[in-house]
Amino acid sequence: MPFFQQLHITDTYVYTWQLTEAVAQLRVGLPLSQGEEERLCALHSEKKQREFLAIRHLLREAQLPTTALYYTSEGKPQLEGQYISITHSHNFVMIALSLRPIGIDIERCLPRILRLASRFTPWQAPSDMDELTQIRAYTQLWTIKEALYKIADFPSVRFYEDLQVPHFEPLAPRQQALITHPEGNKAYKGQSFFWEGYIWSMVSEE
């Protein structure tokens, strides 16, 4: 199944591709510039190549030329005239397009998040919360913080300390988010979406 979903959320468009195709299938009907061909060939992982091609299919779904996408020296994706954020997890690839800064992240809900939780958040799940809910809650927190990291325009942002979800309500679809930094604090709004086995979150300026 190729193109999976298009969502319009306020002033943001989110496009999702469910990756089921091989590289050869993804190349069909997708002309690439010489620069894009060189970048594709430089990717030695088939998974990375498939993601690269899926992103360009999504740009075409958004009626944008694939060559409109470029990256800063820090590796952040850029478009002229609007903001873009890109994420992928297992067989899903997503892009978000907006006229204001936007961050997006998708993650598969896996038990290993419980081992990693103390490394990225001070929040602790209540002792009476069942394991499945804990996995989903920590995955939600991770996606919000990852989306915050992508939207951050401060230098040297610390993932644990500076990216915060100060009043986290597990599995609530809307969350407050905050970047604290010596150059100033900035508040954001977070939205989370729950698919079977996956959680993705989007962060934008308030």
Write out the residue ranges for each language-model feature.
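Core catalytic alpha/beta fold that binds nucleotide/phospho-ligands
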Residues: 1-206
